[in-house]
Amino acid sequence: MNKAKRLEILTRLRENNPHPTTELNFSSPFELLIAVLLSAQATDVSVNKATAKLYPVANTPAAMLELGVEGVKTYIKTIGLYNSKAENIIKTCRILLEQHNGEVPEDRAALEALPGVGRKTANVVLNTAFGWPTIAVDTHIFRVCNRTQFAPGKNVEQVEEKLLKVVPAEFKVDCHHWLILHGRYTCIARKPRCGSCIIEDLCEYKEKVDI
């Protein structure tokens, strides 16, 4: 895909959604961090249902520590992998209190040192909480970038590297959100909704379907 096509795709996505954001509910960097930790192999809807009950009780590292692992589990049992997630949350809260004055660090290395936090989670937090021009690549974005040929790659690392290289600076902060929403609602895994796609004429997917 050439530069002009990519620019037009990003321009249309921006025109369609000028102020995109995550569908996870949060009101602080800490709430976002916990929500993203919970979102692995879970839907944003299921995470939001759990945090709607959890956050009124505990939305700081200290309050979460008071709940303890078993206490956290009672609020997140509807989410997959809740046992390991509860343990990671408590370990993370302890580190935040002991090493970061109870604050979520605006630092990639410090974030990735937290239990359960990998590059993708760190990218989401840095981008959505702190406005960094990072681009977290999940399954939706991986699919969209390969299917459209916007930024093809054999794995998420290659796709992220390509995106950071080809996406102009003015689009970088919002790019993650545009692509994930496009993959979640239009360029879906099975039977993509090409007929209602705003970038269908620019897409290089060879098996486009007019639905």
From Swiss-Prot:
Keywords noted in UniProt: 4Fe-4S, DNA damage, DNA repair, DNA-binding, Glycosidase, Hydrolase, Iron, Iron-sulfur, Lyase, Metal-binding
A GO BP annotation: cellular response to UV
UniProt EC number: 4.2.99.18
Pfam families: EndIII_4Fe-2S, HHH, HhH-GPD
Cofactor, how bound (note): Binds 1 [4Fe-4S] cluster. The cluster does not appear to play a role in catalysis, but is probably involved in DNA-binding and proper positioning of the enzyme along the DNA strand.
The HhH domain, residue ranges: 108-127
Gene Ontology MF term list: 4 iron, 4 sulfur cluster binding; class I DNA-(apurinic or apyrimidinic site) endonuclease activity; DNA binding; DNA N-glycosylase activity; DNA-(apurinic or apyrimidinic site) endonuclease activity; metal ion binding; oxidized pyrimidine nucleobase lesion DNA N-glycosylase activity; uracil DNA N-glycosylase activity
UniProt superkingdom: Bacteria
Effect of residue 120 to Q: 100000-fold decrease in activity and slight decrease in substrate affinity
Heme as UniProt keyword: no
Cofactor or coenzyme needed: [4Fe-4S] cluster
NCBIfam families, per the entry: nth, PRK10702.1
Subunit structure: Monomer.
Protein family (similarity comment): Belongs to the Nth/MutY family.
Protein name: Endonuclease III
Organism this protein belongs to: Escherichia coli (strain K12)
